Amino acid sequence: MLNPSRKLVELVRILDEGGFIFSGDPVQATEALRRVDGSTEEKIIRRAEMIDRNRMLRETLERVRAGSFWLWVVAATFAFFTGFSVTYLLMDNQGLNFFLVLAGVLGMNTLMLAVWLAMLFLRVKVGRFFSSPATWFRGKDPVNQAVLRLYADEWRQPSVRWKIGATSHSLWLCTLLGMLVSVLLLLLVRQYTFNWESTLLSNAASVRAVEMLAWLPSKLGFPVPDARAVIEGRLNGNIADARAWSGLLVGSIACYGILPRLLAWVVCKILLKTSENGLDLEKPYYQAVIRRWQNKITDADTRRETVSAVSPKIILNDAPKWAVMLETEWQDGEWFEGRLAQEWLDKGVATNREQVAALETELKQKPAQLLIGVRAQTVPDRGVLRQIVRLSEAAQGGAVVQLLAEQGLSDDLSEKLEHWRNALAECGAAWLEPDRAAQEGRLKDQ
């Protein structure tokens, strides 16, 4: 089973292999993490967070998790009231057959627990008896299909037996708790008498059976009937012994119903926790990412897929991070959110030379990194390029230009992006391509 961060990585992989257009560019995220310290898995997780810049994928996974939780809540509530109602019906008469009530309360639970143990020791694949989550829903959008595939793949993992086991035990615990509450409530407000009947069992055999049944509850302090009460209880209800019989009933539910289920649930949760899988970094998709990080030289033909270096080079660290928009305000006021998986402080819009100069002075006083937003659909002029150079030189932590485009790739945008690439390269500035346009361009070239 995968934790939420690894689920996000796998979801990104599935979508990327299908040509999905993300809110963040996968290639730019890969290049941005080239010089970042950390283990390979940590960097791949961070890369997925950068690709999911608008958090849509994380929110989708969270909705699935929340939906599963509330589905369990509904099932648990139903199980509780089912157990409560069944027990209420079993104890509808004043004179109760003890063994009949006990069998009605614990019979099915004990049988299903035995079936689970048999499947466990026989190593039966429980996935054969349950439908895959991929068969429960149908969705046409790529994200929904990818989520279904993600959980279908997870369903085939060996550790799914512990997930199913923990869920089953938790629902049975709710059922048993409903039964216990019903028993306690009825014993509190009604006067019952207990008897027992048997055609085959003698008094001695019945006494022995009750002694064996009562051993554990008596050790835990529950009142239990003695041999005299057992013998006198045959076909007859005795109010004087009712408390002992009721104590044995409650103790049996606790000791032979709730306690074994609770232990089984704990075992499943522990084994589920210890069986958490790491990412399979041997998959071709991850190997391609790792090779890009290991490759120190980037071919000139792939220039638009990289984050160019500036002096000082941009290194993702804990330095203050500021974001500023040049010339005019962008329609998305949070255009900087999630860029390079960092939290950027909005410094507003620098619309004239005075505001650029003020920001330049502030940058020289604080070692901040700067994200500069410019409209990619405008032709780069000398004034804007001069402002970019001044701000990049003043940013002690480095600066990167984010080219912004309202729509996807078009012939006009492609031409203007090429002008921006040439101009920024001549200035020695780093830049990030428009996320959607960069991805559409690569898909078009494939």
Curated annotation (Swiss-Prot):
Keyword Transmembrane in record: yes
Main location: membrane
Membrane topology, record value: Multi-pass membrane protein
Keywords recorded for this protein, A-Z: Membrane, Transmembrane, Transmembrane helix
GO terms for cellular component: membrane
Top-rank taxon: Bacteria
Transmembrane domains' residue ranges: 69-89, 98-118, 169-189, 247-267
The keyword Membrane belongs to this UniProt entry's keyword annotation: yes
Pfam families, alphabetized: DUF2868 (PF11067)
Subcellular location: Membrane
Misc remark: Present in outer membrane vesicle formulations which are used as vaccines in human.
Protein name: Uncharacterized membrane protein NMB1645
Organism this protein belongs to: Neisseria meningitidis serogroup B (strain ATCC BAA-335 / MC58)
